[in-house]
Design a protein with these regions (language model features):
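Alpha-helical transmembrane segments and their immediate juxtamembrane cytosolic regions
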Residues: 1-194
């Protein structure tokens, strides 16, 4: 009633589920100067504090920004998703400082592939396809997007490491038409999402 809803929308207090991705970007960009300052003091300190906040939110998902439309708060909890942002900034700073991407450690590559295979089997909708449920952990594992559960974070980190440590993947991304188009989509991810 009245124009109270306008104020709620402008203050990001009325966000329908998946539509708070834009406000999430704004909050992350607004918090960037703080993270950058912490990185200038000590890169490990910045990552440690960011990781501690992420872990706190994973232990208590109720720690979230308020949302008038959803009593659980923002669908994409900025207090959790900031850690992925922090990991990306730290990885970028690290590779820029070294002048190259991550070293390819065979044991770590194997671990990433094994985890991603497990993740694919666990996430596949077996019963929707009329197949027997082959998920190793069944319903016991339900990774949340809202507070960036560890399983979702591991997915992203494993894929990131496999790409950033592979000369072949970098060459494919730089030289192939598909790789260049994917890079173009990535540079315009907000517009693509909207």
């Amino acid at each position: 009633h009245g124009l109270g809803w306008v104020w709620r929308v402008m203050m990001f207090d009325a966000l329908p589920s998946n539509l708070n991705i834009m406000p999430l970007y704004l909050v992350l960009l607004g918090g960037f100067p703080i993270f950058y300052l912490l990185m200038r003091i000590h890169r490990s300190l910045a990552l440690l504090l960011s990781g501690a906040l992420w872990m706190l939110v994973n232990m208590d998902p109720g720690l979230n920004f308020p949302n008038w439309l959803d009593p659980d708060g923002w669908y994409f909890n900025p207090l959790a998703w900031q850690f992925l942002f922090a990991l990306g900034l730290t990885a970028s700073a690290q590779t820029q400082r070294r002048g190259r991407d991550f070293a390819r450690v065979p044991a770590l590559v194997a671990l990433c592939w094994v985890y991603l295979l497990f993740s694919a089997i666990q996430a596949f909708p077996w019963t929707l396809w009329g197949l027997p449920d082959l998920r190793p952990l069944g319903d016991a594992l339900a990774p949340s997007k809202s507070w960036l559960s560890p399983w979702r974070l591991f997915d992203v980190v494993a894929i990131f490491y496999l790409v950033q440590s592979s000369e072949r993947a970098r060459r494919w991304a730089a030289e192939s038409w598909v790789g260049q188009e994917l890079a173009r989509v990535g540079r315009s991810s907000l517009e693509v999402f909207v």
